[in-house]
A protein has these predicted regions:
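Active-site ligand-binding patch in enzyme domains
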Residues: 80-81, 86, 90-227, 235-238
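Residues at the N-termini of beta-strands
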Residues: 35, 129, 227, 247-248
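Flexible, gly/pro- and Lys/Arg-enriched active-site loops
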Residues: 241-280
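Hydrophobic/aromatic beta-strand patches that form the interior of the parallel beta-sheet core
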Residues: 9, 37, 63, 167, ...
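Zn2+-dependent cytidine deaminase-like catalytic core
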Residues: 1-71, 241
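Short gly/pro/ser/thr-enriched loop/turn and capping motifs at secondary-structure boundaries
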Residues: 43-46, 138, 174-176, 255-260
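Conserved histidine-centered catalytic loops in small-molecule metabolism enzymes
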Residues: 269-301
Length: 301
C-alpha cells in the first residue's frame, strides 16, 4: 500500500512469468504504482518486453533505458547466462614483465606479491566456481578456496563465507596429488574425456568430443554455476582464449623478468591479420605495491 502512486526504479525489466517467485509485474500492477523507470529489458526471450507491455496495458507509465549502460554492467553475469547459455567467464593470470607465468621447472610461487594474491581472493569470493586444468591441479595441489576473513570481505562476523564450486578440466592421472581440492565437503566437478569412479562430493562429467569446452560450460550453467574464475596454466588459459570463451581477463604483472626459457602465459596461434585478433577493452588499472593489475572486457562478446 505504501508504494501506491509512487515512481519505481529498477535496473532490470520486472519479470512477467512465474518461476521460483510470483511475477514482479503483477505485484506492481496490484499495488498501483504510477510510473516505472527501467534500465534494461530482460534478455530472456520468455520475458523480453512482456513485463513492460503488461504494465502499459494496466495504465502504468513506463520509461526504458535509464542508465542503460550502467545497468548492463551491473547485470553482465545474468545477460551472459541468458544470451550465451554459459557462465560468465573470468580468466586470471599472474605474469612477469616478459609475459612468463612459471620457470622452466614449473615453479611459480610466487610471481605476484601478497597484496595481489589477496585481491585475487576477493575475485574468488564473487564467483560461483573456480576452474583449473588437471595439470595445474596435480602440480600445485591448490585449495581453490576463498581465504579471507569476514571482515576483509565486508561480512558480519557470523555470516558464512560462500565457497565456490571447485572445477577441474581434464583427466586426473594422480588423484593423490590433489588432496587439497578434495578435502572437506566442498563440491567438486571434473570435466574430461576419461572415466572415473563416483565419489561422495565429486561429479564427473564425461565427454566424447575432444573439444568439449563449450559443452562443459553449458553443463556448468545447468548446475547453477553462473560465473567462474579460470586460474589455469598455459594450456587451460589458451583453450579458453582460442575458443573465445571468456568475458573478462585479469592480469597481475610483477616487476621481474623470468627469461626466454620460462613458460609463457598466453601463447595462442597468431591470426593471419591484425583485424582478426581478439579485441579487448581495458576497464581498470590498479596498483598493489609494485604489481600492476589490469582488467579487460572481451570486445567480441
Amino acid at each position: 500500500k505504501l508504494i501506491a502512486g509512487s515512481n519505481v526504479y529498477v535496473n532490470l525489466e520486472p519479470c512477467s512469468i512465474e518461476n521460483n517467485t510470483p511475477p514482479c509485474s503483477n505485484a506492481l500492477i496490484k499495488y498501483q504504482i504510477k510510473k516505472l523507470f527501467c534500465g534494461t529489458l530482460d534478455p530472456n526471450p520468455k520475458i523480453n518486453g512482456r513485463g513492460i507491455k503488461l504494465l502499459k496495458k494496466a495504465g502504468i507509465e513506463t520509461s526504458v533505458g535509464l542508465l542503460k549502460n550502467q545497468c548492463k554492467e551491473l547485470n553482465r553475469v545474468f545477460f551472459t547466462n541468458q544470451k550465451k547459455s554459459r557462465p560468465y567467464i573470468i580468466l586470471k593470470s599472474a605474469q612477469s614483465l616478459d609475459g612468463k607465468i612459471a620457470l622452466k621447472n614449473g615453479e611459480s610461487k610466487w610471481i605476484s606479491n601478497p597484496q595481489s594474491r589477496k585481491n585475487s581472493h576477493h575475485i574468488r569470493s564473487t564467483v560461483k566456481g573456480i576452474l583449473v586444468g588437471s595439470h595445474t591441479a596435480e602440480q600445485d595441489n591448490p585449495s581453490l578456496t576463498v581465504r579471507l576473513t569476514n571482515n576483509e570481505l565486508g561480512l558480519n562476523k557470523h555470516d558464512k563465507i560462500q565457497q565456490p564450486v571447485k572445477i577441474i578440466l581434464g583427466n586426473l592421472k594422480r588423484s593423490k596429488k590433489v588432496s587439497k581440492i578434495f578435502a572437506g565437503n566442498s563440491k567438486v566437478i571434473v570435466g574430461s574425456m576419461g572415466s572415473a569412479k563416483k565419489s561422495k562430493n565429486i561429479e564427473y562429467l564425461k565427454y566424447k568430443k575432444k573439444n568439449f569446452l563449450e559443452e562443459f560450460m553449458q553443463d556448468l550453467l545447468d548446475r547453477n554455476i553462473s560465473s567462474i574464475l579460470v586460474e589455469g596454466g598455459q594450456k587451460t588459459l589458451n583453450a579458453f582464449l582460442v575458443n573465445n570463451l571468456f568475458d573478462e581477463l585479469v592480469l597481475y604483472t610483477a616487476p621481474m623478468f623470468l627469461g626466454k626459457e620460462s613458460k609463457d602465459g598466453i601463447s595462442i596461434i597468431a591470426p593471419e591479420k591484425i583485424k582478426a585478433s581478439v579485441k579487448l577493452k581495458m576497464i581498470g588499472v590498479e596498483k598493489f605495491k609494485d604489481d600492476i593489475k589490469t582488467t579487460y572486457y572481451n570486445k567480441d562478446i
